[in-house]
């Protein structure tokens, strides 16, 4: 598996982070997991921190057990080992971050950024664009340059109102020097209503529908074609 020349390095592993909580990381992650699975790929999900709800969403979307990566509760060696062990037979490994990218228990210690650097994987930044347009440029620029050891490989915008809105956001990415990988349109059906979701049969059916809709959105506005940087070659299918 490889993404040579894609801007994501030689490994089809990356972390999905965000500037803040409630940016749409989980919705995008679920959609991407299912979209890649629907393409016949083995996708291994992970979650930063001890969260057990998001890992359940990941499993529903990917068909594989999602694994917690936590540098507060476990050693760096343990985190590296389980990341490698669970992803050994996968075509792509996707780590969903927690809170804002640099938010940890002591500055950025224990943060999603720390885990991305520990595993030496790039970050896809999800930005909530609900009430903003070109002003995302300095935000993206800041995330790109705040820590030179961390690679921000691209941006996906969430809560985009229209193609015209996306045009402003795409220009902001270009001026900040970070690739724009796509967007998800504003859609109330793509909002996870509560942390209880998925704990009952009825709620699981609702979650499955949300995953299906998110995957459709990701396929149409992020992946778009088989050669997209987020999609590694399918074994034997080139």
Which positions does each model-derived feature cover?
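Intrinsic disorder/low-complexity segments
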Residues: 1-10, 227-238
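ATP-dependent carboxylate-amine ligase catalytic core
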Residues: 9-23, 27, 33-119, 127-154, ...
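Short conserved micro-motifs on helix faces and helix-strand junctions that flank
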Residues: 21-23, 176, 230-233
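Short, electropositive, low-hydrophobicity segments enriched in small/polar residues
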Residues: 28, 67, 101-104, 186, ...
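Short hydrophobic alpha-helical runs that function as membrane-insertion/retention elements
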Residues: 123-126, 181-183
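Internal gly/pro-rich beta-alpha loop/helix module
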Residues: 134-227
């Amino acid at each position: 598996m490889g993404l040579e020349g894609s801007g994501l390095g030689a490994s089809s592993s990356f972390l999905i982070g965000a500037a803040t909580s409630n940016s749409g990381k989980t919705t995008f992650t679920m959609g991407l997991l299912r979209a890649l699975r629907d393409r016949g790929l083995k996708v291994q999900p992970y979650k930063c921190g001890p969260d057990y709800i998001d890992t359940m969403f990941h499993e529903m979307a990917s068909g594989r057990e999602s694994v917690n990566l936590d540098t507060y509760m476990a050693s760096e060696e343990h985190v590296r080992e389980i990341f490698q062990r669970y992803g050994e037979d996968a075509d792509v490994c996707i780590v969903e971050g927690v809170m804002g990218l640099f938010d940890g228990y002591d500055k950025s210690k224990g943060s999603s950024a720390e885990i991305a650097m520990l595993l030496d994987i790039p970050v896809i930044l999800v930005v909530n664009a609900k009430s903003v347009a070109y002003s995302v440029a300095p935000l993206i620029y800041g995330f790109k340059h705040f820590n030179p050891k961390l690679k921000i490989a691209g941006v996906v915008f969430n809560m985009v109102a229209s193609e015209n809105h996306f045009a402003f956001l795409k220009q902001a990415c270009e001026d900040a020097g970070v690739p724009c990988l796509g967007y998800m349109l504003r859609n109330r059906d793509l909002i996870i209503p509560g942390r209880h979701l998925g704990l009952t049969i009825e709620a699981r059916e609702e979650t499955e529908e949300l995953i299906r809709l998110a995957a459709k959105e990701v396929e149409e506005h992020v992946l778009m074609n088989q050669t997209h940087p987020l999609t590694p070659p399918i074994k034997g299918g080139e």
